[in-house]
């Protein structure tokens, strides 16, 4: 990190500290958030339209706005170190510094450079879920710590500061993930996990670091979830959520929707359960008939795909009171300019 970037990062950190200082003071918190908005607008220049910041200011001054309440709940419940490091690494480092760096290097090298990189530290997993695409790779493959760290170092030189882990089950390698997050403290890390290996000691380490977030796999309520993932897994995932919530960690869910569970996992009752246990967001991925014991009959119908397209937009809108940010990996492609594969915005390195 060069001297100029260090100064800019320190300034961004001070602005975030200014918000956190007033976390427990209603009027002062709003003022601090407005000041942070002014700082971001000045700092980013013409990177975003002026109207974007005007809309944010209007929203922040409306305490009844659902997304203002969402932000305030996060400030109340998330650990200050988690808030600061997420804002610095995902906001300043990845979205601001990284985006500029990537655009410059795309022109320089005349090739795609991903904004985020997905890596499989291992193909090993402690579960045996029906229809798991990752099982296609086997269970004995691993990327060494040195290889993982080297990939991240190379990525940072190009402007990539956001790294996601899947598998297998990435937390089979949780000691290495903690080590990576400490070594590359200017990066944001995200784990797609089944949640069963999350314990108190791990949560304490993540809380101290602040730059790791999580998406826990859940397929619906207990009967449906455990029917695909194994007996007792539903309760273990909820227990992991409660533990992470206690430590103020940032997490949500990763949901594979099928013909059988689509209505359930988008229902008000299910969303209320997620919110109650501390989830801030939920990823939705439609079932694909690949992997272990693939079942084509579980593919969503055309009508169901239409339904979830509109249902998730309804949940995000002011018409819904659900304070959880939902995203559909396939159906929300319009917001990232279409397909992100081929290194355009995303690259996947498996454990092979």
Q: PLM features: residue spans?
A:
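Conserved alpha-helical substructure of the radical SAM core
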Residues: 34-201
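Conserved catalytic motifs of the protein kinase core domain
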Residues: 114, 211, 344
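A short, flexible beta-alpha/helix-coil linker loop
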Residues: 135-139, 221-223, 289-292
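Radical SAM/AdoMet-radical enzyme domain recognition
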Residues: 145-165, 171-286
